[in-house]
Amino acid sequence: MSYLLPTIITTLLILLALIIWFYVKTQTLRTQLQFLSEQNLEISNNNQLLNQEQIGYLQKIEQLQCKIEYQAQTIKDSEKIREESFSSAKAALFDLGQDLSKQLIEIHKMENTAARELAEKNIATASGKFNSEFERLITMVGALNKDIEQSKGTVDLIKQSLLSPIGAGLLAEITLENILKSSGLRPNLDFIMQYGLTTLDSGKLRPDALIFLPSGNLMVIDSKASKFLVDKQDNNMSLNKTMNYHLKSLANKEYAANILTNLNKKDQSFNNVMTLMFLPTEQAVEKVIAADPEFLQKAWGCNIFPVGPSGLMNMLSFAKFQITDHRRSENYKVIIEEVRKLLSSIGTMADYSQKIGNNLHNMVTNYDKFAASFNRNFMSRVKNIQKLGIDSGNKAMPATLERYQIVSSKSEIIEVEAENPPQIAEKL
């Protein structure tokens, strides 16, 4: 009996799965049937409306027929009255009345034919629209069913990818790269992704990210993930084993010694290396701590700091502040030198402007002297010559030249006490 128990349990589980699948399939088909029933009801209502319109058109046709019959009867009665009244009339008048009657009958026949053709055309148009809408609904239902099947396959594929070790690792690396790009740090200057290096024993290491901090500090980030972190089932033992293996392998890599050796060969001086184990979600950090409460103590003992996205963002914000402050302090001397050059340029410009002002002053003074001499000496002689009878022709002589004077004044300089002058003096 003991060996039949697993078989029975397996059979029951299979039956339960089949029942659940049958139930879900039944609910899906029931939903589709309800949707088709509603569509069929709507189509039936449209068909009833079309039938009512058809009945209305038929009634109008019958009314027109009755009207035509009534008019025909009236025409016949009028013909009889004419025959009785104008029996003694001339044959020409009788022929004329008969022709008019025929024309009226033909007109009424044409009106009846046009009305019938219009009604048949409207009915055919409505029937065509109904058939096209019904075919469109059937096509939409088929396409919707196909899309549902494709979406189900896509969801299963994504789920299988996330539950695989490679998929979980790629998820952690993508999350890390997105956080670094949104942190404000400069790629290939403040941080490097997927930095490859060779160890002392010719081994290959490839940390996910290196962040260069001021004062010879370096932050190494290595993302770790496991399918048990994204799996909803409780696999604490497997998760504990996997994450402790990651911690051991990360500690055995000796990032600090290998990275310092590798970077010092490239004329880059780093003194302190801090290693971060990045987990893709905060829930992953909580699951690791729940699986092994001593995991953080073990990691800290190896100088490794497990962090999630929130913890990493906090550390990156502090790192960005340090990098920005260090960059500002490095650029301080350059800024002072540029300010000195600017002040020197201002002095040179002031010298040139002083020379230009002096030249303008000399030009205006000399012009004023010339205008005074011209008006006083030259123009007086010209007037004397004109008095003697010599005309200047069509060109009118000016009375006097306008004189100009330039006024120079010294600008007042308003002195303002500088804030914290001792500190500025110390920096300069």
Curated annotation (Swiss-Prot):
Family annotation (InterPro entries): DNA_recombination_RmuC
Disulfide bonds: none
Keyword set includes Repressor: no
Protein keywords: Coiled coil, DNA recombination
Domain of life: Bacteria
Biological process according to GO: DNA recombination
Coiled coil: 25-84
Function: Involved in DNA recombination.
Family: Belongs to the RmuC family.
Name of the protein: DNA recombination protein RmuC homolog
Provenance organism: Rickettsia conorii (strain ATCC VR-613 / Malish 7)
Gene name of the encoded protein: rmuC
